[in-house]
C-alpha cells in the first residue's frame, strides 16, 4: 500500500497573524488568540497596541522591539508598542507593512484579524485559502455593483490621483480580516497610500475612523474599509473570497464570527439586560465566552459561571422577547 502523507505535515508555508488594539479591546485579543490556538494555529500573533499591555499577559519576555507572551506550546503573542497618531483602524496596512519589513520578513503569508473576531475553523483552512489569492470575507453590505454610484465615485478618486482601475468588482469586503501572500503584499502599500491621499484631499481624517462628514459626501470614502475595496480594484492580484457568512453576518457561517458595529462588544455586553430589550445572545457572544479561558485565562471562574448563566437565561428569554426587525 502506498503511503499518502498528511497534508498538514508536508505544508511548509510560514505564516503569522497580526492585530491592533487599545483600551479594553485586549479582551478580544485574548479570545481571538485562544480560538486560533484551539483550532490548531501554532506560530506568532503580532499585536500592535497603544496604552498598556494586558493584565493577563504575565511573565513577558522583552526582546528587540517587542515583548513576548507564551500562549502555549509553539505559540506566542508578541506585543509591539505603537506611537502612531492614526486611528488604529487606518493603521492596519501600515502595521502589516512594518511587520513584513522589520519583524517577520521571511514569512510566506500574513493574516490580519480585528480584535473583535473569534475564529471557528481549523488553521490549515486559512493556509490553503491564502495560497489561492488574497483572502477576504464579504461585508454585511455585500452587493455593491460595479456601476453603483458610490463605487464609481471611488474609482474617479483613484483615477484623479493617477491610478488605473484594473478590474470591476460587484462585491464589498470587510476590512476586519485579510490574508495576504508575500507575492501580493504591495496591495497593502496601495491601501495605505489611498488612505493618505484621502486625508490630503480632505476626504478623511486618519485620526477619526468614521468621520461623519465623509459617508454622504463625494467620493464617499468612509473608514478604512472603503479604501481597501478601492485598492482591490486597482490591482489584478487573484482574490479568494467568501460571502457575509464568513463572518456570521448571515446564518450558516463556519469560518469566523465578527462583532461589528452596531453590536455591543461581547466583553461589554450585559447579556440579561440586552435579552430583556429583545436582543438575545449572538453567536459571537457565545463564542467569545467559550474561548475566554483557555489557554489564556481572561476572567475569574466566578465571572465565567455568571456569564454562562446569563447566556442560558438570555437565550431562553430570546424565544419570547425579540426586537422587531428594521
Label the model's feature ranges.
Residues 29-30, 89, 93, 175, ...:
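Conserved glycosyltransferase catalytic-site signature
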Residues 3-87, 101-106, 300-326:
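N-terminal anchoring/stem segment of glycosyltransferases
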Residues 90-145:
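GT-A fold catalytic core of metal-dependent nucleotide-sugar glycosyltransferases
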Residues 127-193:
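Conserved catalytic core of nucleotide-sugar-dependent glycosyltransferases
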Residues 57-65, 145-161, 200-215:
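Charged, glycine/proline-rich intrinsically disordered loops and linkers
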Residues 38-42, 101-109, 114-116, 181-187, ...:
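Secondary-structure boundary elements
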Residues 10-12, 119, 165-168, 174, ...:
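A glycosyltransferase accessory/donor-loop signature
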Residues 46-48, 109-114, 119, 136, ...:
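A structural signal for short, well-ordered beta-strand segments and their strand-loop junctions
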